[in-house]
Amino acid sequence: MRHHNGLRKLNRTSSHRSAMLRNMTNSLLRHEVIKTTLPKAKELRRVIEPMITLGKKPSLANRRLAFDRLRDRDMVGKLFSELGPRYQTRNGGYLRILKFGFRKGDNAPMALVELMDRPEQPATDTESKAG
């Protein structure tokens, strides 16, 4: 039985919800870490995990499927050239969702969503001068 296997509506119409998740997916692929509310983060995981699995098998059909879902040529290129090879040996679990306190205005639970096995960013000049 498939009781309670639906998706979170997030108080949006279906077109608004799909556009928001597409934008969040593109942002996460571009920056590799984003901050959002916890329900959005949990719903984003259901979208982006299959996308990265798609990126592990570079074929024209998979590129077209990815472009159909992402609508961003640069992110499709990054998905297949950078992220697919990075997660070639990992069988799922590409995201880490960390609880990040509560938003000041409406006390919504926030979350930090990041890709696993991110390459370490070198410290910028301002960070090294401050420390």
Curated annotation (Swiss-Prot):
Tree of life domain: Bacteria
Entry annotated with the keyword Thylakoid: no
GO molecular function: structural constituent of ribosome
Gene Ontology CC: cytosolic large ribosomal subunit
Keywords carried by this UniProt record: Ribonucleoprotein, Ribosomal protein
GO biological-process terms attached to the record: translation
Subunit details: Part of the 50S ribosomal subunit. Contacts protein L32.
PANTHER family linked: LARGE RIBOSOMAL SUBUNIT PROTEIN BL17M, RIBOSOMAL PROTEIN L17
HAMAP family: Ribosomal_bL17
Family as reported in the entry's similarity comment: Belongs to the bacterial ribosomal protein bL17 family.
Name of the protein this chain belongs to: Large ribosomal subunit protein bL17
Organism in which the protein naturally occurs: Nitrosospira multiformis (strain ATCC 25196 / NCIMB 11849 / C 71)
